[in-house]
Curated annotation (Swiss-Prot):
Gene Ontology biological-process entries: copper ion transport
CDD domains on file: HMA (cd00371)
NCBIfam families linked: chaper_CopP, copper ion binding protein
Listed result of changing residue 66 to I: In strain: A68, NCTC 11638 and NCTC 11639
Gene3D superfamilies, per the entry: 3.30.70.100
Stored InterPro entries: Cu-bd, Heavy-metal-associated_CS, HMA_Cu_ion-bd, HMA_dom, HMA_dom_sf
Organism listed in the record: Helicobacter pylori (strain ATCC 700392 / 26695)
This protein's name: COP-associated protein
Annotated ranges, domain HMA: 1-66
GO molecular function, one term: copper ion binding
Length: 66
């Protein structure tokens, strides 16, 4: 499964690193693409990962998800 999250609070590479760390810890996540320019995060994943778990990880990383 693939999901795109709009994350307007992404401003720098530190944000990218933190997002990759938090989302990458979720079992089932196979790909993460964070774009500072587009302020988006694209995640490819399989169970047990879910969109809700990914959104929670983004929030835990200090990001706003819309």
């Amino acid at each position: 499964m693939k999901a795109t999250f709009q994350v307007p609070s992404i401003t720098c590479n530190h944000c990218v690193d933190k997002i990759e760390k938090f989302v990458g810890e979720i079992e089932g996540v196979s790909f993460i693409d964070v774009s500072v320019e587009k302020k988006s995060v694209v995640v490819e994943f399989d169970a047990p990962a879910t969109q809700d778990l990914i959104k929670e990880a983004l929030l835990d990383a200090g990001q706003e998800v819309v």
